[in-house]
């Protein structure tokens, strides 16, 4: 028999897109302060689901983070 659903469940609150909220139109690889917000403490790029950015912004962020790593502005990762 299926469980009854809770009637008092509230919908998830929509969190704003952090890049749109800050007015960022171009993601620059030299802006390490911005890029660090989208990198985990282990050095991995955070997912869209966690950061709430659009797919186009996620691609721009990934490219900028990879360029910043190549230029030694960001670490590749830690163990």
Curated annotation (Swiss-Prot):
GO terms (molecular function) for this protein are:
small ribosomal subunit rRNA binding; structural constituent of ribosome
Which keywords does the record carry? Answer: Ribonucleoprotein, Ribosomal protein, RNA-binding, rRNA-binding
Q: Which GO terms describe its biological process?
A: translation
Ranges of Basic and acidic residues composition bias in the record: 1-11
Q: Does the keyword Ribonucleoprotein apply?
A: yes
Q: Which Gene3D superfamilies match?
A: Ribosomal protein S18 (4.10.640.10)
Task: Tell me the InterPro entries matching this sequence.
Answer: Ribosomal_bS18, Ribosomal_bS18_CS, Ribosomal_bS18_sf
Chain positions covered by the region annotation Disordered: 1-24
One Gene Ontology cellular component: cytosolic small ribosomal subunit
Entry annotated with the keyword Nucleus: no
Its biological purpose: Binds as a heterodimer with protein bS6 to the central domain of the 16S rRNA, where it helps stabilize the platform of the 30S subunit.
The UniProt subunit note reads as follows: Part of the 30S ribosomal subunit. Forms a tight heterodimer with protein bS6.
As for family, the record states:
Belongs to the bacterial ribosomal protein bS18 family.
The molecule here is called Small ribosomal subunit protein bS18B
Q: Which organism is it from?
A: Streptomyces coelicolor (strain ATCC BAA-471 / A3(2) / M145)
């Amino acid at each position: 028999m299926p469980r009854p659903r809770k009637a008092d469940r509230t919908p998830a609150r929509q969190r704003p897109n952090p890049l749109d909220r800050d007015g960022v139109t171009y993601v620059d690889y030299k802006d390490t302060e911005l890029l660090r917000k989208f990198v985990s403490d282990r050095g991995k790029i955070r997912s869209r689901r966690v950061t709430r950015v659009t797919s186009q912004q996620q691609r721009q962020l990934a490219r900028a983070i990879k360029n910043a790593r190549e230029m030694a502005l960001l670490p590749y990762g830690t163990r």
